[in-house]
Amino acid sequence: MSAGASGGSISEILTAIPIDDIPAVEVGNGCYRRDLPSGADVRVWVVDILPGCEWPNVDQHDKAGEELLVVSGELIEGEQRFEAGTYVYFLPGSSHRPRSEKGVRLFGFNVSAARTYS
């Protein structure tokens, strides 16, 4: 359905926010997360990891796994390096601890995010 068909304006059917206007939550030294507006059962987020920093704990995934896009910089997972423009899918039940030597911005989402996040 388009905004015109409903008789309302486009602003009534969407939310548009500059990413950097969303307050960042520091989850560890040099690691920041922004939670974006999203529908039920989907958690959408942006993570920034500053140069030389590592996620503060091991990130464990449930039965849906985790999907992310490296927006800028370089993500390091184990011995693998992922540059901007790389899509990464972590399988259900997987775990990882991301880090970056150059700094990185990630856009990701978790489907069916029934657990609480801190």
Regions found by a protein language model. Name each.
Residues M1-W45:
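A short, N-terminal "cap"/entry segment at the start of jelly-roll beta-barrel domains
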Residues V47, V88, G108-F109:
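Preference for bulky hydrophobic residues occupying beta-strand positions
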Residues L68:
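Structured binding elements
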Residues G65:
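Alpha/beta-hydrolase fold active-site loops
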